[in-house]
UniProtKB/Swiss-Prot annotation:
It is an enzyme of class 1 (oxidoreductase). Heme binds at C519. Its cofactor is heme. The keyword Membrane applies. One of its GO terms (molecular function) is oxidoreductase activity, acting on paired donors, with incorporation or reduction of molecular oxygen. It comes from Glycine max. It comes from the Eukaryota. Keywords: Chloroplast, Heme, Iron, Membrane, Metal-binding, Monooxygenase, Oxidoreductase, Plastid, Transit peptide. The lineage of its organism: Eukaryota, Viridiplantae, Streptophyta, Embryophyta, Tracheophyta. Its EC number is 1.14.-.-. One of its GO terms (cellular component) is chloroplast membrane. Residues 1-44 form a transit peptide. This is Cytochrome P450 97B2, chloroplastic. InterPro entries: Cyt_P450, Cyt_P450_CS, Cyt_P450_E_grp-I, Cyt_P450_sf, Cytochrome_P450_Monoox.
C-alpha cells in the first residue's frame, strides 16, 4: 500500500483499451515495448544519441529549454540543463528519458517542460536530504494539486499540518497484531483467486487440458481491490468473481486519478469542466457512489462501537475479531471525535494508493520470474519446504525469505511509483551528490523536484549489474569506499526488518519513499504481495504467453502494461 505514491507527468495523449480496468478507456499514458531487464538499457536509449551535437536536436526542444532558462533566471547555480527534444518523449515512458539524461548530465539536473522547469534527482545523498534531513521544507507540490479533488485531505495531498495530525492517528493502526490479522485476509482472498483458476482449468475452450491463458495483471488488480476492501473498510467487493456499481465506480475513480497524474494541464479545475466534459461528469457520479458507500460504512462502524476504553482497545485479540479493519480501529480509537469527512478522505487515499501498487508489484514479479525459470523453481522449492500444501501465516512469512526478496527486487526494477514529487517550501541548497558540484545547488522556494526512483534503483554507480534480476543482491553487503556521503548497502543496518528498505541502502532503494513521509502502509503491501505470490507459485507453473518484447509498458501512477500480462498457467505436476 504505497501511501506516498506519485507519478509521471506527460504531454502526450494516447488512448488505449486496458483489460485491467475492465475494458475502460485509458488515455494520456506512454507505452513502450519491453524485454528482459538486462536488455532494457540498450532499448531505452535508442531515441537519444548523446554523441550528437546539441545543435542537431529538435529545434522546438531547444527553444523550449531556452525559454525555461530565461524565465527561471538562468541555470540554478551551475546545475546542468537537460536539452532533450520533445521528440525524445514521444512513444516512450518519461522515466526512460529521465534515465538517459541522468547518464548524460549527472545525478542532479534541470529539465524543461515548455516554460516550466523541474529539478530531477537521481542520487541517494540528495534524495536523503530532501526526504529525511530536510523533509518539512518540502511538500507534495503538483501531486497535491492534482489529487486533492479526489483524496481531499488524505495523507498524500495533505498539507504538512494536516499530515502530521493524520499520521499520528493512522500509523498506530498498522501494528503487528493488525498485520497478523490481515495475513488471514490476504490468504482468504488469494484462495478465491486460486479457486477461480482451478475452475477455469476444469473448463473447456482453452489451448489444452492442462493449461489456461489469463491476463494476470487484471486478476491481480481484482485481488488487490478485494484485499483493500476487507482490510481497510471491512467491505467485500468480491471483484474476483463479480462486478457491481460500487466496483465500477472504484475503477472509474482509479482511472481518473491516473488520468490526472499523467495530464500536464489541469483542465478539471475549470469550474464548468465537471458539467461540460463527459469524463468529468462520470467522475463526479463515480465519486458520489463511492462516497455514499464509505459514508454508510463509517456510520455503521460508529453505531456498532462498543468498547471505549483505549487501553483495552489496544490489547484486544485482532485474530479473533469479526471486524479487524483499519476503519474499525480508527473509529474505536477516536470515537465520536473522528471527523467523517477526514476519515472518508483517509479511506479514499488507502483505496487508490493501496490497490494499484500491489497489482503492479505482482505483475512485474511474475514477468521477471517467467523469464528466469531457475529462480521460479527455487521460489517454489522454498514454498514447498516451508508450507507444503498449507496456507501462509504471519509466522511463516519470516521463513519465506526468497519470496520476500523476489518482491523487493521486482520493486527495485519496476518501482511503484517510478517518481516521487516534491516542491520546496523555502530556498534550499541541494547536495551535489556523486560527481556533482562540491558546493551543491541552490534552489529557490517553489522549485518542483522529481526524485527518480527508477534512476536510483538502476544507477550503475550504486548497484552491481543494475538491470539484472538478482533477488539475492539484498543479502550481500556493499561497502562503499569510493562515494563520499553514501554509506553503501548493509543488511545489518535494519535489524529485525523482514524486507530491505531505504535504511539498509542509505536511500539508494526507495520502494515506499523515506523519511517522515514514508508510506505508512509499506508492510501491509509487502506482506500482501508475498502471500499472493506464494500461493500462486504453490499451485501453478507460470509462463509468458508471448515474448518479453511483446509486453508493452504503460506508465501512469504506476508502471503497468498496455494490453495486460498474458500468461499460461499450468497446475504444478506434484498437485495434478
Amino acid at each position: 500500500m504505497s501511501v506516498d505514491t506519485s507519478s509521471t507527468l506527460s504531454t502526450v495523449t494516447d488512448a488505449n483499451l486496458h483489460s485491467r480496468f475492465h475494458s475502460r478507456l485509458v488515455p494520456f499514458t506512454h507505452h513502450f515495448s519491453l524485454s528482459q531487464p538486462k536488455r532494457i538499457s540498450s532499448i531505452r536509449c535508442q531515441s537519444i544519441n548523446t554523441d550528437k551535437k546539441k545543435s542537431s536536436r529538435n529545434l522546438l526542444g531547444n527553444a523550449s529549454n531556452l525559454l525555461t532558462d530565461l524565465l527561471s533566471g538562468g541555470s540554478i547555480g551551475s546545475m546542468p540543463i537537460a536539452e532533450g527534444a520533445v521528440s525524445d518523449l514521444l512513444g516512450r515512458p518519461l522515466f526512460f528519458s529521465l534515465y538517459d539524461w541522468f547518464l548524460e548530465h549527472g545525478a542532479v539536473y534541470k529539465l524543461a517542460f515548455g516554460p516550466k522547469a523541474f529539478v530531477v534527482v537521481s542520487d541517494p545523498i540528495v534524495a536523503r536530504h530532501i526526504l529525511r534531513e530536510n523533509a518539512f521544507s518540502y511538500d507534495k507540490g503538483v501531486l497535491a494539486d492534482i489529487l486533492e479533488p479526489i483524496m481531499g485531505k488524505g495523507l498524500i495531498p495533505a498539507d504538512l499540518d494536516t499530515w502530521k495530525q493524520r499520521r499520528r492517528v493512522i500509523a498506530p493502526a498498522f501494528h503487528n497484531s493488525y498485520l497478523e490479522a490481515m495475513v488471514k485476509i490476504f490468504t482468504t482472498c488469494s484462495e478465491r483467486t486460486i479457486l477461480k483458476f482451478n475452475k477455469l482449468l476444469e473448463g473447456e475452450g482453452y489451448d489444452g487440458p492442462d493449461s489456461i491463458e489469463l491476463d494476470l495483471e487484471a486478476e491481480f488488480s481484482s485481488l488487490a481491490l478485494d484485499i483493500i476492501g476487507l482490510g481497510v473498510f471491512n467491505y467485500d467487493f468480491g471483484s474476483v468473481t463479480k462486478e457491481s456499481p460500487v466496483i465500477k465506480a472504484v475503477y472509474g475513480t482509479l482511472f481518473e486519478a491516473e488520468h490526472r497524474s499523467t495530464f500536464y494541464i489541469p483542465y478539471w479545475k475549470i469550474p464548468l469542466a465537471r458539467w461540460i466534459v463527459p469524463r468529468q461528469r462520470k467522475f463526479q457520479d463515480d465519486l458520489k457512489v463511492i462516497n455514499t458507500c464509505l459514508d454508510g460504512l463509517i456510520r455503521n462502524a460508529k453505531e456498532s462501537r462498543q468498547e471505549t476504553d483505549v487501553e483495552k482497545l489496544q490489547q484486544r485479540d485482532y485474530l479473533n475479531l469479526k471486524d479487524a479493519s483499519l476503519l474499525r480501529f480508527l473509529v474505536d480509537m477516536r470515537g465520536a471525535d473522528v471527523d467523517d469527512r477526514q476519515l472518508r478522505d483517509d479511506l479514499m487515499t488507502m483505496l487508490i494508493a493501496g490497490h494499484e501498487t500491489t497489482a503492479a508489484v505482482l505483475t512485474w514479479a511474475v514477468f521477471l520470474l517467467a523469464q528466469n525459470p531457475s529462480k521460479m523453481k527455487k521460489a517454489q522449492a522454498e514454498v514447498d519446504l516451508v508450507l507444503g500444501t498449507g496456507r501462509p501465516t504471519f509466522e511463516s512469512l519470516k521463513e519465506l525469505q526468497y519470496i520476500r526478496l523476489i518482491v523487493v527486487e521486482a520493486l527495485r526494477l519496476y518501482p511503484q511509483p517510478p517518481l516521487l514529487i516534491r516542491r520546496s517550501l523555502k530556498s534550499d541548497v541541494l547536495p551535489g551528490g556523486h560527481k556533482g558540484e562540491k558546493d551543491g545547488y541552490a534552489i529557490p522556494a517553489g522549485t518542483d523536484v522529481f526524485i527518480s526512483v527508477y534512476n536510483l534503483h538502476r544507477s550503475p554507480y550504486f548497484w552491481d549489474r543494475p538491470d539484472d534480476f538478482e533477488p539475492e543482491r539484498f543479502l550481500v553487503q556493499n561497502k562503499n569506499e569510493e562515494i563520499e556521503g553514501w554509506a553503501g548497502l548493509d543488511p545489518s543496518r535494519s535489524p529485525g526488518a523482514l524486507y530491505p528498505n531505504e535504511v539498509i541502502s542509505d536511500f539508494a532503494f526507495l520502494p515506499f519513499g523515506g523519511g517522515p513521509r514514508k508510506c505508512v502502509g509499506d508492510q501491509f503491501a509487502l506482506m500482501e504481495s508475498t502471500v499472493a505470490l506464494t500461493m500462486l507459485l504453490q499451485n501453478f507453473d507460470v509462463e509468458l504467453k508471448g515474448t518479453p518484447e511483446s509486453v508493452e509498458l504503460v506508465t501512469g501512477a504506476t508502471i503497468h502494461t498496455k494490453n495486460g500480462m498474458w500468461c499460461r498457467l499450468k497446475k504444478r505436476s506434484n498437485l495434478r
